[in-house]
Amino acid sequence: MKKEKSCGAIVYREKDGVEILLIKHKNGGHWAFPKGHVEKKETESETALREIKEETGLKVELDTGFREMVTYSPKPNVMKDVIYFAAKAKKDSARPQPEEVLELRWEPPQEALALVTYTTDREVLQAFLRYLAQS
């Protein structure tokens, strides 16, 4: 069984309430969060920061106090762990990476929950919203 690992984050901003950044991936057309494979000697947080910058152009403040892991099998004989952190956007000027991202959207929490394609991502978003409410 081959193991893969990706890291990313739930990127948010506070603008008349909290808004969540969702990206529509070119590969599959699903709505999710910025993430990508860990490269060589990167830490989880370095990977998350790099992927957010690549996919959205945003500089963010990473909050590693929030850390959720999702495990799934993207194809036979492969198990993938995805680590998600929280990341507060420093600016609103997100721009999609044309090679990987079809569209970017800032959405209020309830709309984001409805738009996210996969149940596991919805569960991570719910955990993030609970975390944010306690912070």
Set out the residue ranges of the language-model regions.
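Short, solvent-exposed aromatic-acidic interface loops
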Residues: 26-29, 102
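Generic C-terminal helix-cap and adjacent flexible tail
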Residues: 130-135
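Short, acidic/hydrophobic/Gly-rich beta-strand patch recurrent on exposed beta strands
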Residues: 21-24
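Unchanged
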Residues: 38-64, 68-127
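Conserved N-terminal beta-strand and adjoining loop/helix that marks the start
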Residues: 1-19
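A short gly/proline-enriched turn/hairpin at secondary-structure junctions
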Residues: 32-35
